[in-house]
Amino acid sequence: MAGVLSRDAPDIESILALNPRVQAHATLRSTAAKKLDKKHWKRNTDKNCFTCEKLESNFDDIKHTTLGERGALREAVRCLKCADAPCQKSCPTSLDIKSFITSIANKNYYGAAKLIFSDNPLGLTCGMVCPTSDLCVGGCNLHAAEEGPINIGGLQQFATEVFKAMNIPQIRNPSLPPPEHMPEAYSAKIALFGAGPASISCASFLARLGYSNITIFEKQEYVGGLSTSEIPQFRLPYDVVNFEIELMKDLGVKIICGKSLSTDEMTLSSLKENGYRAAFIGIGLPEPKKDHIFQGLTQVQGFYTSKDFLPLVAKSSKTGMCACHSPLPSIRGAVIVLGAGDTAFDCATSALRCGALRVFIVFRKGFVNIRAVPEEMELAKEEKCEFLPFLSPRKVIVKDGKIVAMQFVRTEQDETGNWVEDEEQTVRLKADVVISAFGSVLEDPKVKEALSPIKFNRWGLPEVNPETMQTSEPWVFAGGDVVGMANTTVESVNDGKQASWYIHKHIQAQYGTSVPSQPTMPLFYTPVDLVDISVEMAGLRFPNPFGLASATPATSTPMIRRAFEAGWGFALTKTFSLDKDIVTNVSPRIIRGTTSGPLYGPGQSSFLNIELISEKTAAYWCHSVTELKADFPDNILIASIMCSYNKSDWMELSKMAEASGADALELNLSCPHGMGERGMGLACGQDPELVRNICRWVRQAVRVPFFAKLTPNVTDIVSIARAAKEGGADGVTATNTVSGLMGLKADGTPWPAVGIGRRTTYGGVSGTAIRPIALRAVTAIARALPGFPILATGGIDSAESGLQFLHSGASVLQVCSAIQNQDFTVIEDYCTGLKALLYLKSIEELADWDGQSPPIISHQKGKPVPRVAELMGQKLPSFGPYLEQRKKIIAASKIRQKDQNTACSPLQRKHFNSQKPIPAIKDVIGKSLQYLGTFGEMSIMEQVVALIDEEMCINCGKCYMTCNDSGYQAIQFDPETHLPTVSDTCTGCTLCLSVCPIMDCIRMVSRATPYQPKRGLPLAVKPVC
């Protein structure tokens, strides 16, 4: 049988050992064997495992919400972008959540970050530490669906981290005059105390408003407040805090460290004497609440408050926080953490990283009363912290100068709801360290006296107006923890944001200037926003290259008006005709495509429609065009018209449209359904002679530019475009919808089906599914007719896809299906996205980025993974015994590295500046044409092969299966580790990369040896017939 060509050779049979086969019978395997199997392949924690993972000195990211680019794109596409989105109503800083998620889904990470930072200057910090389950995620409408709510925090973190990697500075609002030309009020002295989230937010917004004399006074030698000193590195890295502070400093805000609000240094009275017009108090709550039973206990004996412990951990683990280097607190044995808030859980998980053997989280009430967010509680549970509810501390037991145990009494809730302590029920817990996390207060008399004469409430905190954040002293404002209303970082940020507007209002009033009663907060700007994306085509200047196609978004002129108000650069009217050709539509007529599979809701890859041209009269459209041009003179408005093959009709209608004031005309010669039966649309657009003549007639009738709208339903679209040019057309639109039949139901009836007869017809397919057809048409016309203007349409749904059409030779871009999927506001995403894509081309340091996508590092679930192969010379997957082995190797590596930390200076952010000119739209038009050609022009000598990154591989075997049954059997799949290995028989076909679910897990690299095709039989062998 060895000579049988149609059977796999023995070596191939060996490769195919794990390839799926059709099952011919049920499978039998013993329960005992299956339990062993389960253990080998297990990826989550074994419920029978009670040992703690060694976490000492491991400050790697532990958040479940963290996302890589793949995860972010999948999650963003899932979002419904709801009309009156509840998530946005639940965000303290009122983030435009659905819009920034739209930008992420469209790979416009700059646009997403711009939206986030516009409402929240600490958008990256909040993306990492926000209790989203209680805020935005808590209101997500997808809670009502099987797949559950959107990971909003992870998306926010991802977009802002990508922006952070761009190293682009923040700039002042471009519409403001230079600082030296601003009114005198904007140079007023403003002081802020405490460099935490509330003050950073307040100062950022004041600087965006135009104020130039803003100083933050911070008593510590580091900045960031609790974000730096108390939120652990594994939840919030210091470089994130530093990045947001540097963004603030980009606007000229000054920070002076080592200066505190105290009678010993600075007071409100001294500020006023020194000419400060406004002050903001954002000092937090600096002293810990401490139970009387801890009097006299110190760190030497093993007692810490959270205010002692967490800053010590931070100084050791947060590189760049300060110039000094200090070791982690030496924690051994059992640790008791008292409290049930977020801080208590931070103490617990940090204690494990300081060497604790076991951690007990003890709290007075039950699990249902835990104040910490579920995310924090779940992480502590996963790290094997023990939870002990219903216990109130009574006594600390010290022996030989060291804590050895604590005594508690049981608590319970009585019938009236009050909590009582039962002194008869006592519990004694052995412990080596006790950490108290019972909250914080403002008690320092020197600080309180320095705040005089502001009033304090019954909790000893500054009394403020909750709407303005103004204290009893009109020029003094306060926010954050010190006010007692903000319980989270994001609420502190909003306090600062809120205060900034009323500080602005107060200062302006002092100078006799009024401000709007409705706050108008300034946005976040960078040099990207200065990029010019206007473009000229056929003598017309388009404000930006994005416009409404002659389709459903242009059903009426009020819709076009709203589109122009939203920022669209141009629009086409819905195609209209002479009254004698007026139409009436059927219904149903616009349906979702089947190309998206079982994806319902927004994000459809295609639609099919059997809608005809506009049902409205030519008079309606012409009157409306006149109105719109009067109100939007800078926007381009193109009238789309259609007639049968009749010279007088075309001349009459085109003159009518020109007289209305339309900037240009589009001749619809391509409607693929319905109109062709009337001798219009497709009936005219498939014959070059008819197209040429119609264009000649219109050229004789009008002076304004006109464009022929072409159909892709022809063999040679170039011949149609050439005919249009020969007829005098100023350009073409490529392309209209593709004729198709979307699907049939199980009973054989079509959808859409009209009337009781369930009739249908071939319709027009639109959306991203037809983008390859449209790109082919645009590039073919651009190559054949250089310089001939092309209006592209067909699957444009983002700045990235729009740039593809510009690179293909189009000058402007028409959009329809993407608006059907969302709404007119997507234009903001398209414009910021295109500006970013152009701007990034000017930065040498980002030359290895793919648009707005940075190079992907080896990661699992969005978190960088140590390359275990480099640590021990062995490749290990991330499941079962191999996962346990990986954890041990990484733990040992972290302990080895802990003593290698060296002192370092505070981090300095380096801006990436443009080294090359920022390309204009005209510079990128047709850029890709140089790469297109015939098959014979491609090299058969420069071959590639697949290279798999085992650290990123999730061991699914999709590459293996497609190579076996659709390729060349060049991938081996280990039966124990499920690690795929590419053999030297790889032909570089790239199918494996195409089906791999993990971005950049497989790369195609240059082949090191000459490629020798397998011919089956030598070329000299003749066939046997």
Curated annotation (Swiss-Prot):
Class of this enzyme: oxidoreductase
Signal sequence residues: none
Keywords for this protein: 4Fe-4S, Acetylation, Cytoplasm, FAD, Flavoprotein, FMN, Iron, Iron-sulfur, Metal-binding, NADP, Nucleotide-binding, Oxidoreductase, Phosphoprotein, Repeat
A Pfam family it matches: Fer4_20
GO CC, alphabetical: cytoplasm; cytosol
Binding-site list for FAD: 129, 194-198, 218-226, 235, 261, 480-489
Name of the protein this chain belongs to: Dihydropyrimidine dehydrogenase [NADP(+)]
Cellular localization per UniProt: Cytoplasm
Protein EC: 1.3.1.2
Residue numbers binding FMN: S550, K574, T575, K709, G767, T793, G794, G795, C816, S817
Residues carrying N6-acetyllysine: K384
Function: Involved in pyrimidine base degradation. Catalyzes the reduction of uracil and thymine. Also involved the degradation of the chemotherapeutic drug 5-fluorouracil.
Modified residues (Phosphoserine): S905
Quaternary structure, from the entry: Homodimer.
Chief site of localization: cytoplasm
Binding-site residues for substrate, renumbered to this chain: N609, N668, L669, S670, N736, T737
Origin species: Mus musculus (Mouse)
Regulation: Inactivated by 5-iodouracil.
Binding site for NADP(+): 340-343, 364-365, 371, 437-439, 481-487
Residues annotated as binding [4Fe-4S] cluster 1: C79, C82, C87, C140
Names of required cofactors: FAD; FMN; [4Fe-4S] cluster
Residue positions binding [4Fe-4S] cluster 2: C91, C130, C136, Q156
Residues annotated as the enzyme's active site: C671
GO molecular function, one term: protein homodimerization activity
Pathway assigned to this chain's UniProt record: Amino-acid biosynthesis; beta-alanine biosynthesis
Catalytic activity line of the entry: 5,6-dihydrouracil + NADP(+) = uracil + NADPH + H(+); 5,6-dihydrothymine + NADP(+) = thymine + NADPH + H(+)
